[in-house]
From Swiss-Prot:
Its EC number is 3.4.22.-. The active site is at H218, C266. This is Caspase-12. The modification Phosphoserine is found at S84. It comes from Canis lupus familiaris (Dog).
Amino acid sequence: MAGKRQSQDPVNAIKVVASTMLNSFLEDLKEKNVLNKQELQTMGQTVNVITKKTENLVGDLTEKTQVVGKIFKDHFLNSGSLLSLKSHAENEDECSESSSAVLQEIQASQVKVRKLCPCDHSHEPKITNVHEIYPVMEKEGRTRLALIICNSEFDYLSKRQGSEIDILGMQDLLENLGYSVVVKENLSALEMKTELKNFAARQEHKFSDSTFLVFMSHGTLDGICGTKHRNEEPDILHDDTIFQIFNNRNCRSLKDKPKVIIMQACRGRGDGAVWVTDVGEASAWTCDQPLQCYIFNDAIEKTHVEKDFIAFKSSTPHNVSWRLNTDGSLFISHLIHYFREFSCCHHLEEIFRKVQNSFETPNTMIQMPTIERVSMTRYFYLFPGN
């Protein structure tokens, strides 16, 4: 069988397929009275040239009618199936039973690849398996929602000047990514919780493939500050509250769909910097007590309570996040820039890492964004324009 494969010239095999396609194509033109006899004879004389140099085919037909274009399109697309079938036929002794299934899988993959957004950047989406990415719904009939909560006015804390720039920037970004954006401003922790519950209950999520939750406010290590916050009486929206409202137990409409949380807020008063020498000693935390693990399972249905989340925060724990009264927050401005630059060809976590990399070299305003509480099981590509 190996000798049979070597004796067959693959170039000639492709020419045979191309010639067969063209002959069938010309017959259809004749039957439908698109070309007369003289024109058919003229085209017939060029078949050999077309077979050897197929890129001239389109040029030979551009002056014909739309009917010619439609017939050619049908035959040209079917040629991919002919080539695929011929390739599988060479191994029919070894895998005749599975060839049709493999072909169907390849064709299904090709259909999905055609739906990817065109990327003006030099890199194409690096997708090796369509099952490794979150499904993206068709634009028609899809109802993506995003929520922005921004607190700029507080009863006891300073005004967050420049926050209006962050709102406009994030709203424009998310709308261009296909999300209808809900904006809420100046809420207490209780009011934020109420708005989150209302947003989680929106019926549009049933016909959506993902959601974004954006929080911009003063903050502490414990969470996002509400408008009534002060040291004596904390007004804090905790991370756990957000995750609980949108987990699979309480928000079924977003089950198995990416839920992206973005937080612009301080997480302490530290500046996030330390002076180090070129050579240092590292210390490790130790514990005298042995690690004990107890596993319990209270779930009623066979699904993870918390899954498909990712949180991107503007700074590391205990440290500040910087904001300019004229340009808005550094984190938000960098985030918007890299989303616009790379969302067509990189998945979400890669974009987040590019934002982190932009903060890698410390300068006057030091902060390091962090990716936290990740439970996403696939790559999330945004495919802008789709």
